[in-house]
Curated annotation (Swiss-Prot):
Coiled-coil boundaries: 139-223
PANTHER family from the UniProt entry: BCAS2 PROTEIN, PRE-MRNA-SPLICING FACTOR SPF27
GO terms for biological process, alphabetical: mRNA splicing, via spliceosome
Gene name per UniProt: BCAS2
Protein name as annotated: Pre-mRNA-splicing factor SPF27
UniProt modified residues of type Phosphoserine: 94
A Pfam family that the UniProt record links to this protein: BCAS2
Function: Required for pre-mRNA splicing as component of the activated spliceosome. Component of the PRP19-CDC5L complex that forms an integral part of the spliceosome and is required for activating pre-mRNA splicing. May have a scaffolding role in the spliceosome assembly as it contacts all other components of the core complex. The PRP19-CDC5L complex may also play a role in the response to DNA damage (DDR).
Signal peptide feature range: none
Stored InterPro entries: SPF27
UniProt-annotated location(s): Nucleus; Nucleus, Nucleolus
Organism placement in taxonomy: Eukaryota, Metazoa, Chordata, Craniata, Vertebrata
Listed GO CC annotations: nucleolus; nucleus; precatalytic spliceosome; Prp19 complex; U2-type catalytic step 2 spliceosome
Amino acid sequence: MAGTGLVAGEVVVDALPYFDQGYEAPGVREAAAALVEEETRRYRPTKNYLSYLTAPDYSAFETDIMRNEFERLAARQPIELLSMKRYELPAPPSGQKKNDITAWQECVNNSMAQLEHQAVRIENLELMSQHGCNAWKVYNENLVHMIEHAQKELQKLRKHIQDLNWQRKNMQLTAGSKLREMESNWVSLVSKNYEIERTIVQLENEIYQIKQQHGEANKENIRQDF
């Protein structure tokens, strides 16, 4: 229910769910559903009812790699397999190229690259064996601190929500008690007004009867005088 003296956009909510009763009474749910259905029938949104919103930019977070993958999926092309050539160690050339220095040099360079790659992997494994355990412990401790902080924030939010619910409940119960008292006063005033009006009507009838009696007595006196 909107108030008449309110700022535009403000609404006075006259529902007191913590105080009102009768929601579970037979027919209440059906009546509410009927009101909702009636509102949905009267509300006919147009095709451009979202025209006041800005046009969505679906490509805001797209990258070139994502765009290429979307195009590949749209064209129903199979995914390109990873090249494993860099991990292969081909044998030295044979046949006509067994005396080709360039071919031998490529084979040696590939072998050196593979050897260096394996050496780096070994170093990484050694570093992991020395420091990986402590690094993992530190990482887990950071996760524990983050979880504890998040749980504290969650407890604060829950307490804030509970306090708001209690405040709302107290406000509604107070308002409901005042409304009930005002309703009782209104009923009492209406009853008193009814009694006053009935008494006034009775007095008016009595006055009318007295006037009639006085009028008849005056007429009788006049007749006797003549």
